[in-house]
């Protein structure tokens, strides 16, 4: 079922979308777009606490996803089941579930949204594009994406409501 959905998404393939989604997915590589945004927020006194919370959410989501859940589930990537699909990016060697790009992106996007809707809405839109790019590029199953969304969102909610909400209302 999931491979059928991925194959349907893959049928959207065209040169423009190929370049677009390769560029979008690269923003999520090693969480670089989120780390840069976090540093920018840290450098502004008004947004420093938000930057700390966002980066902490990113760090915890990455740790739980990459170090605990991926080795525990040990799910192979979709391209291993369908080798005739041409992969447009370097083939990831780590396990598939949950999507690290998606988890990191939603950790940051959700945390920003909880703190500041103006910052959060564009961040969630970017997170959604990054998540979709992982399926378009055939490196994640839809449930990997869902797992990343749930993990990143859960970490952000826990951090925000247990630690940061009070600190941010004091500002």
Segments the model singles out, each with a brief description of its role:
Residues 1-32, 66-94, 170-171:
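N-terminal transmembrane-helix/juxtamembrane module of multi-pass inner/ER membrane proteins
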Residues 16-17, 46-50, 115-122:
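Membrane-helix interface segments
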Residues 34-44, 105-110:
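Hydrophobic, aromatic-rich transmembrane alpha-helices
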Residues 37-63:
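Interfacial segments of alpha-helical transmembrane regions
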Residues 41, 65, 69-74, 113, ...:
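Membrane-water interface at transmembrane helix exits
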Residues 53, 57-62, 66, 148, ...:
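Alpha-helical transmembrane segments in multi-pass membrane proteins
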Residues 56-70, 121-133:
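Small-polar-interrupted transmembrane alpha-helices in polytopic inner-membrane proteins
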Residues 86-171:
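Membrane-embedded catalytic cores of phosphoryl/pyrophosphoryl-handling enzymes
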């Amino acid at each position: 079922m999931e491979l059928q959905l991925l194959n349907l998404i893959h049928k959207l393939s065209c040169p423009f979308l190929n370049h677009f989604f390769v560029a979008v997915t690269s923003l999520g590589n090693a969480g670089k777009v989120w780390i840069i945004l976090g540093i920018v927020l840290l450098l502004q006194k008004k947004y420093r606490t938000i930057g700390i919370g966002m980066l902490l959410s990113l760090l915890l989501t990455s740790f739980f996803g990459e170090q605990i859940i991926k080795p525990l589930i040990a799910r192979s990537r979709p391209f291993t089941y369908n080798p005739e699909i041409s992969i447009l990016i370097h083939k990831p060697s780590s396990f598939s579930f949950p999507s690290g790009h998606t988890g990191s992106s939603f950790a940051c996007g959700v945390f920003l949204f909880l703190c500041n809707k103006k910052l959060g809405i564009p961040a969630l839109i970017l997170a959604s594009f990054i998540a979709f790019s992982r399926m378009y590029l055939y490196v994640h199953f839809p449930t990997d994406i869902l797992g990343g969304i749930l993990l990143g969102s859960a970490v952000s909610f826990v951090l925000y409501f247990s630690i940061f909400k009070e600190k941010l209302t004091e500002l």
